[in-house]
């Protein structure tokens, strides 16, 4: 199970594979940040971490972690459909959580799509790692292209 999974930081040469994985995993709608250029910027940011899960030399999962000096955030947890329910997502969360805490984060939050009840169920299953739902917050976003056009 999860012992066969290797987790490590993504290599720049693998960024196109990450974009394909996100499309295949269908965990979130495509975003304006979904590009090789965007991911290249991300992996060169000191507070950012993009981890991949590998089985048999194949990338089967990924997760982004960001630390801004105040809190850690987890984004884009994705596992390819045929590899789900094998402990990969949990392992990625354990690894990204450790990386963000090592950077200095005292609290982590994860963005989870409301449209995916299975994702909410997954995060509920991580209570033993300290994760809990926080109903106090709603998320608001602004895309640069829209902001600049107003």
How does the language model describe each region?
Residues 124-135:
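Conserved acetyl-CoA-binding loop of GNAT-fold acetyltransferases
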Residues 77-84, 112-113:
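A short, internal acetyl-CoA/4′-phosphopantetheine-binding micro-motif in the GNAT/acyltransferase core
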């Amino acid at each position: 199970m999860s012992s066969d999974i290797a987790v490590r930081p993504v290599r720049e040469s693998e960024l196109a594979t990450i974009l394909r994985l996100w499309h295949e995993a269908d965990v979130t709608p495509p975003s304006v940040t979904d590009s090789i250029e965007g991911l290249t910027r991300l992996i060169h940011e000191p507070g950012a971490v993009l981890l991949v899960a590998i089985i048999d030399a194949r990338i089967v999962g990924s997760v982004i972690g960001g630390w801004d000096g105040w809190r850690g955030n987890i984004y884009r947890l994705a596992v390819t459909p045929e590899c789900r329910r094998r402990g990969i997502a949990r392992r990625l969360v354990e690894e990204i959580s450790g990386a963000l805490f090592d950077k200095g984060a005292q609290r982590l939050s994860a963005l989870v799509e409301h449209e995916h009840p299975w994702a909410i169920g997954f995060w509920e299953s991580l209570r033993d790692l300290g994760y809990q739902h926080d109903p106090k917050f709603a998320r608001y976003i602004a895309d640069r292209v829209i902001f600049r056009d107003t």
